[in-house]
């Protein structure tokens, strides 16, 4: 697995975990009747902190563990290929395009709920939801392009 594929896989796993936590907490707030601005904005903070710190920590940990395993197997220092060639840049560009497309669609749907009479809190909750989903879809698309060989 290439350096870029490892990064994408770790990011995908982290954002799937974050999406699960986010959906669990939103459903829990709705069922408890505690779906208010304070709780939703606190959840936003948790999601943002998780997205930043867990992704960075998990990426570093994954590369360290993969390097240790490779060093044990080959009895040599592992070669880290973090150089991006044109293919990697094109895959990243196409993945970013898909991410932005899904994000834009999510913003449109979120705004549509507001115009259809839903409270602004629903719109803000959907904005974060669609942002995370867009990132997941973009990562899946990037992985598919790497697996397909572009």
Each language-model region and where it sits:
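Helix-coil boundary and interhelical linker segments in multi-pass alpha-helical membrane proteins
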Residues: 33-41, 114-124
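Alpha-helical transmembrane segments and their membrane-interface junctions
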Residues: 98-120
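C-terminal or internal capping secondary-structure element at the end of a domain, subdomain, or sheet
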Residues: 118-150
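Membrane-water interface of transmembrane alpha-helices
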Residues: 57-77
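Short membrane-interface loop/juxtamembrane segments of multi-pass integral membrane proteins
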Residues: 77-99
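Alpha-helical transmembrane segments
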Residues: 41-61, 129-133
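Cytosolic-side membrane-entry/anchor segment at the start of a transmembrane helix
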Residues: 1-31, 140-150
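Helical transmembrane-bundle signal
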Residues: 15-22, 51-59, 104-107, 111, ...
């Amino acid at each position: 697995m290439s350096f870029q594929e490892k990064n994408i896989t770790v990011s995908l796993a982290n954002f799937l975990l974050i999406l699960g936590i986010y959906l669990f907490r939103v459903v829990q707030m709705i069922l408890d009747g505690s779906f208010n601005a304070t709780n939703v904005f606190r959840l936003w903070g948790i999601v943002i902190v998780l997205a930043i710190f867990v992704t960075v920590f998990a990426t570093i940990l994954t590369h360290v563990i993969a390097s240790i395993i490779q060093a044990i197997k080959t009895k040599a220092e592992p070669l880290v290929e973090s150089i991006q060639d044109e293919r990697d840049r094109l895959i990243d560009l196409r993945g970013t395009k898909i991410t932005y497309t899904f994000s834009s669609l999510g913003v449109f749907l979120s705004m549509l709920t507001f115009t259809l009479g839903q409270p602004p809190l629903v719109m803000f909750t959907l904005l974060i939801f669609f942002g995370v989903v867009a990132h997941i879809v973009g990562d899946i698309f990037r992985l598919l392009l790497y697996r397909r060989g572009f």
